[in-house]
Structures are given as C-alpha cells and as structure tokens.
Amino acid sequence: MTATVSFGPWLRATLLGWLLGIVLVVALALAGEGLGIGGSQISVGLGMGLGVGLFQERALRFRIGPSRAWLWASALGLTLPFLVVDLARLLGHPIPYSLYATIIAAGVSAGAAQARLLRPLGIAASAWVTASTVGWTAASLMGALADSFTAWSPVRGVPGALLYLGVVAAGGLLLGAATSVPLRTQAYPGSLE
C-alpha cells in the first residue's frame, strides 16, 4: 500500500490541463469578442479552471470518486477573482487590475474550494491552500517572465515564439510540482492507492 500520489502522473495531468487551459482561455476570449464582451477577464479563470480541473480530476478520480466536483471546484475557484474584477468594472467601480495578482488570488480561492474534497484523504486544508497558492504564484511568474521577453530577449521569430511558449508551459510544471507536495506527503496510508 502506498499513501502517496505518484509525482509523474500528477505532474503530467497538471501540465496537460495547463496546456488545455491556455487553448480554452483563447477560445473563450474569442467567443467573448464575438458576443461583444471583449476585454472580460473571466475567460482566464474559467479556461484555466476547466483545463487544469479536468485533467487533475482524472488523476484523482479513483481517490475522490467519479463526480465532477473537482472540475467545478477548480473552475469556480479560479474564476471567482476574475469575475470580481469584471463585475467591479461593469458596476462602474473598476479596481486596479494585475493579471498576475489575480492569478495568485485565484490560487487561494481554487485551493480553498478544492481542499474540502481532499479532507477525506487526510490532506490538511491549510497545506492544500498553501500549495495551490504557491503553485499558481509560480505559474504566474512564468507568465510574467514570458511576457517580459519582448522587452529584453534577442530571440525573435519562430525561435522566440517557441521560447515564449516553453516558458509559459513551465508554469504548468511548477503548478503540478507545488500541488504534488501535500498529495505525496499528507494522505492517509492507503487513501491514495
């Protein structure tokens, strides 16, 4: 019996979910433009929440059950801070917006929403929320690093685009590595077999 989630499958699931999330963010943003709600930030949280949530849920399905609870906790938790920003703007009370700060807030809210699903496995809510926050912070820093390339990187064209995408993809790896820690170290013996 093992009490841990294997690092490789969790990392792979999170990375694949991250990559799907990027595609979904773009698709939702384009759909928003078509519907006349361009500039809405909700697509960022919803797209990443659905992408990462779907693949992580698949990795956890034999541990937390076959429900869609993890997917919805991820999607709602990651969407909430972006929704607050959008609603404040719509209500005429815009708040200062930082993509990276909002991603960090989304890590907190997603971690809180997901933590209740991990409680039966023996994973402390504080450990999961911390890991989620650290993971999403690291992912947002990779996005900020990639965004800064246009200012300082001499790499241009296709190589520059590939470098950019590689750095952005590394955000998914860091998210997976950070969130794997409580899964690998805190679960009750046998709860994650």
Predicted ranges, named:
Residues 1-193:
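Juxtamembrane/disordered regions of integral membrane proteins
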